Amino acid sequence: MNNIYTTSISLKRKTGDFIIKKEQLSTKDIKEMVMVIREIFKMRGLERVTRELKGFIHNFPSGSYIKFTLKVDHDFSVISSGGGLLGYISDSVYDAYDTFVFSNVDSYLPGKPLKSIDELRFKWTNIQQIVPLLEYQADPSILSKSRDYSTHIDYSCNNHVHPIKVNFSPKQISTQHSLHQQIEKDNLKLSSSPKLKSKEGIVGSPTARAF
């Protein structure tokens, strides 16, 4: 039982990501692994899934680490053909009803023994935690949900983060000041124009006021 680890488990979907170190595993060793898995996922089957897991592990060389996703599935053909009197279903039928589906399979055979199981995180970079399955069984909270910092960043504990201030560059300030000066010059030219003065003189003359 010291040869099986988990990296994530979904009880709702009855799936889990596992790592098994293949050594000299007997049928008893594999059955012990299955006993823990069936307790976690609330399964009834044992013999069929034990054979399936044993056959799966058999495909890899000794000393390798096998990473895979396991899903608890069901063989409905067994139930439909195995019903008895008044719908009674025997334990043997229930045992054959549960089945394992393996996916996302990868393996790694290190050149030398690993000092720690956590070294596999450098091999499989998408793994954030590697927890012995027995430890997860004793305390499921040990497999904490990782936070995705690519989509959410929490600045609440960072006292060095300040709001961003946008400042004008000296070039922008001088440009705005020059524009203001140009507008004032244009207004001054208009007010001192002879044409404008003559019009103002006509409007302000006594003759104009008489009308």
From Swiss-Prot:
Superkingdom field: Eukaryota
Protein name, as recorded: Uncharacterized protein DDB_G0282021
